[in-house]
Amino acid sequence: MSRVCQVSGKRVQTGNNVSHANNRTRRRFLPNLHERRFWVASENRWVKLRVSAHALRTIDKNGIDAVLKELRARGEKV
């Protein structure tokens, strides 16, 4: 399973670890992903999404119905 948020599209980023001596080694910054179930009252079912903490705030703000509508408009299977 890829480390990509289904709602916000956040994905793994790359960068460097930097030591005190300024030595640089490559590293990955992982998104804060959670697999969550959301109750969709209009469809009378649970929907399971892999979302970032940022996307959870978006869902709280806009509602799960609006977020699912946007996902389906993008062509994502939900």
Swiss-Prot record:
GO terms for molecular function: structural constituent of ribosome. NCBIfam families: L28. Residues 11-22 have a biased composition (Polar residues). GO terms for cellular component: cytosolic large ribosomal subunit. Belongs to the bacterial ribosomal protein bL28 family. It holds the Pfam family Ribosomal_L28. This is Large ribosomal subunit protein bL28. The gene is rpmB. SUPFAM superfamilies: L28p-like. Residues 1-23 are annotated as: Disordered. It comes from Xanthomonas campestris pv. campestris (strain ATCC 33913 / DSM 3586 / NCPPB 528 / LMG 568 / P 25). One of its GO terms (biological process) is translation. Keywords: Ribonucleoprotein, Ribosomal protein.
